[in-house]
């Protein structure tokens, strides 16, 4: 029953959000294409997706900066695109 409830919540979030473009379930960065990383799902760290690297103004994680990362990424955010850095902006970190 718990699994069913989690699936329902996930489907509702996907249906009513403007979330990230998900390009496929993977395990590590090396399995993703250029310009993407294998980020953990915001709902479960056991599920990872290939998502685009951060662009200017997008949220980022300051410790997540290496692509490809050889291990399993724990953050749901990818590093910034080439030429951008992840820096603190107010209370968040953003690519700039």
From Swiss-Prot:
Looking up SUPFAM superfamilies in the UniProt record yields: Colipase-like
Q: Is Secreted among this UniProt entry's keywords?
A: yes
* Record keywords, A-Z: Disulfide bond, G-protein coupled receptor impairing toxin, Secreted, Signal, Toxin
Gene Ontology MF annotations: toxin activity
Which pairs of Cys residues are joined through disulfide bonds in the record? 32-50, 37-78, 60-86, 80-95
Signal sequence coordinates: 1-19
Tissue specificity field? Expressed by the skin glands.
Annotated compartments:
Secreted
Q: Which GO terms describe its cellular component?
A: extracellular region
Q: Say where the protein is mainly found.
A: secreted
User: Is Hydrolase one of the keywords UniProt gives this record?
Assistant: no
**Which GO terms are recorded in the biological process aspect for this UniProt protein?**
endothelial cell proliferation
What job does this protein perform?
Potent agonist for both PKR1/PROKR1 and PKR2/PROKR2, and inducer of a potent and long-lasting hyperalgesia. Also potentiates capsaicin-induced TRPV1 current, when tested on DRG neurons. At subnanomolar concentrations, this protein both induces potent chemotaxis of macrophages and stimulates LPS-induced production of the pro-inflammatory cytokines IL-1 and IL-12. In vivo, potently stimulates the contraction of the guinea-pig gastrointestinal (GI) smooth muscle (nanomolar concentration).
Q: Which family does it belong to?
A: Belongs to the AVIT (prokineticin) family.
Protein name (Swiss-Prot/TrEMBL)? Prokineticin Bm8-b
């Amino acid at each position: 029953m718990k699994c069913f409830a989690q699936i329902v919540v996930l489907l509702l979030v996907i249906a009513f959000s403007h979330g990230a473009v998900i390009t496929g379930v993977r395990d590590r960065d090396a399995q993703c294409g250029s310009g993407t990383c294998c980020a953990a799902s915001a709902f479960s760290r056991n599920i990872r997706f290939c998502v685009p690297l951060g662009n200017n103004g997008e949220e980022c994680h300051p410790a997540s900066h290496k692509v490809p990362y050889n291990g399993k990424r724990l953050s749901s955010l990818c590093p910034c695109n080439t030429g951008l850095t992840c820096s603190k902006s107010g209370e968040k970190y953003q690519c700039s």
